Design a protein with these regions (language model features):
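Non-catalytic, usually N-terminal nucleic-acid engagement modules in DNA/RNA processing proteins
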Residues: 1-77
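Catalytic cores of enzyme domains
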Residues: 33-34, 41, 70-240
Length: 240
């Protein structure tokens, strides 16, 4: 099968499985970039050619998709949105296996074997990085989340977008951060982390249920994301 046709078929299946968008980049293009020089590469990644990036929109009227829940006794927590992305990735993996193609899901966190998802999404033609350091999708703005899946097939990569959503914007996102982590000079990771740590400390306690232990539910700050005024009107020629 032609590498473009196979790419488009895989993207189509990702959408069938629940993704709101998807794209493909070359593993070498992402992993040879400056950000990944600071972290070990995911184990065995050199055996794979392509990275499928799947996207799931997280609209402002569905905040529960982003609530981070950690059950008592659990080693890790998760959000409903990421659980859905994991399910999409798992279904893609099973389908690719049936097609005779080796693949594997990548962890969300870089330090646990993942990749930089915003960088992967840009290379996969899913958006551009805004002045708020968020990935802005042409249809959904910054209210979107991603997951990556390694594919051992020589897929033709998606084309990165010529898309500048912040060009004519008044940039309200730069003025809403309670920790002043954003300004016209860039993004201050440490200040943002202060707010995220506070969100975790102020987690809502969920009582135990018949089949589930008690849990802590963190509502992470999304002020910069939800204040973004991009309306999602950028049209992409040929997008499925």
């Amino acid at each position: 099968m032609d590498t473009i046709d196979l790419r488009d078929r895989i993207i189509g299946r990702a959408k069938d499985f629940g993704a709101d968008d998807a794209g493909v980049c070359l593993a070498s293009d992402l992993l040879e970039g400056p950000t990944h020089r600071k972290f070990p590469l995911p184990e065995g990644v050199e055996n794979y050619h392509s990275i499928l990036v799947v996207a799931l929109k997280h609209p402002g009227d569905k905040p529960d998709l982003d609530y981070f829940i950690k059950r008592d006794g659990a080693r890790f927590g998760n959000s409903e949105g990421n659980r859905r992305l994991m399910d999409i990735s798992d279904r893609i993996g099973r389908w690719l296996t049936e097609e005779g193609i080796t693949s594997r899901d990548l962890h969300y966190y870089v330090e646990r074997g993942g990749v930089f998802l915003k960088g992967a999404a840009v290379l996969a033609g899913l958006g551009s990085i805004g002045v708020n350091n968020l990935l802005i999708h042409p249809g959904f703005g910054p209210r979107i989340r991603f997951r990556a899946h390694l594919v051992d097939a020589p897929l033709t990569p998606s084309v990165p977008l010529d898309f500048e959503p912040c060009m004519d914007c008044q940039r309200p996102c730069l003025n809403v951060c309670p920790e002043e982590a954003l300004d016209h000079t860039g993004y201050l990771t440490g200040r943002c982390q202060v707010r995220l740590d506070r969100n975790a400390a102020e987690a809502v306690i969920l009582p135990a249920e018949e089949d589930k232990p008690a849990a802590r539910e963190s509502h992470c700050c999304r002020k910069c994301e939800l204040s973004c005024s991009y309306t999602g009107t950028f049209e992409i020629a040929g997008r499925q």
